[in-house]
A protein has these predicted regions:
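An N-terminally biased module of ancient metal coordination in phosphate/nucleic-acid-related enzymes
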Residues: 1-72
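Active-site metal-binding loops of divalent metal-dependent hydrolases
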Residues: 9, 45-46, 80-81, 137, ...
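Active-site mouth loops of central-metabolism enzymes
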Residues: 11-22, 105-113, 166
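Short, acidic/polar
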Residues: 22-29, 87-92, 116-118, 178-179
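Non-catalytic positions within long, well-ordered alpha-helices that form the structural scaffold/packing
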Residues: 33, 126, 183-184
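Short acidic/histidine-rich active-site segments
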Residues: 43, 186-190
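Extended substrate/RNA-proximal surfaces in nucleic-acid metabolism proteins
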Residues: 51-160
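Histidine/acidic-residue-rich catalytic or RNA/ligand-binding cores of hydrolases
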Residues: 144-150, 170-180
Length: 190
């Protein structure tokens, strides 16, 4: 498959803070395809209450909508999980979803997480043979100093950054500079 694969989208309508309805989801699909995306993985937020009952039906319809746009436009299903002590067990039991039935897990943390806690969570997931994809890596201030980013990568995780974090004037904005440096140095994988 050539083209962009977007592994972090809130495109299923009515599930969480993303798309409100199918019209909005279609517009999101069309815009993504026009920008070169050829595969989108829908990643609604994980809830300890379990999977939304309609999640698989919505994912199937999303696939149909993408196919109407172009035959080479594919979709998948996963979740943006929030790390908690029971996450690994929930993944094993199918109560939380990996990215399109792979070993990759899109996981986010509290922005104020300590590096020690973040590292321990990554180790717990990798020891269970999952590959954590840390969502919104730009939000974790504990990674701004030292070698934490490199250490996490060496541990086996992948890093995802929001495109919007690269926008703006990098000359004056320290956050934008940090984000751009991570991309330039090859530390951002998705």
């Amino acid at each position: 498959m050539t083209g962009i694969i977007d592994i972090h989208t809130h495109i299923l309508p009515g599930i969480d803070d993303g798309s409100r309805d199918w019209d909005e989801s279609r517009r999101m699909l069309e815009a993504a395809y026009q920008q070169g995306t050829r595969c989108i993985i829908a990643t609604p937020h994980y809830s300890r209450r379990g999977l939304p009952p309609q999640i698989y039906e919505l994912a199937e319809r999303l696939s149909e909508e993408a196919g109407r746009i172009a035959p080479d436009f594919k979709t998948g299903l996963g979740q943006e999980t929030y790390f908690h002590e029971g996450l690994v067990e929930n993944l094993k039991q199918g109560k939380a979803l990996t990215l399109e039935n792979t070993r990759y897990v899109l996981v986010e943390f509290d922005p104020q997480v300590s590096y020690h806690s973040l590292y321990q969570a990554v180790r717990k997931m990798t020891m269970a043979r999952y590959i954590p994809v840390i969502a919104h890596v730009e939000r974790y201030f504990c990674l701004r100093e030292g070698d934490g980013v490199e250490e996490l990568i060496q541990c086996g995780c992948r890093l995802q950054m929001n495109y919007s974090s690269l926008e703006g004037n990098g000359i004056w904005n320290r956050d934008v500079r940090w984000c751009r440096r991570q991309v330039a140095e090859g530390r951002i994988h998705m």
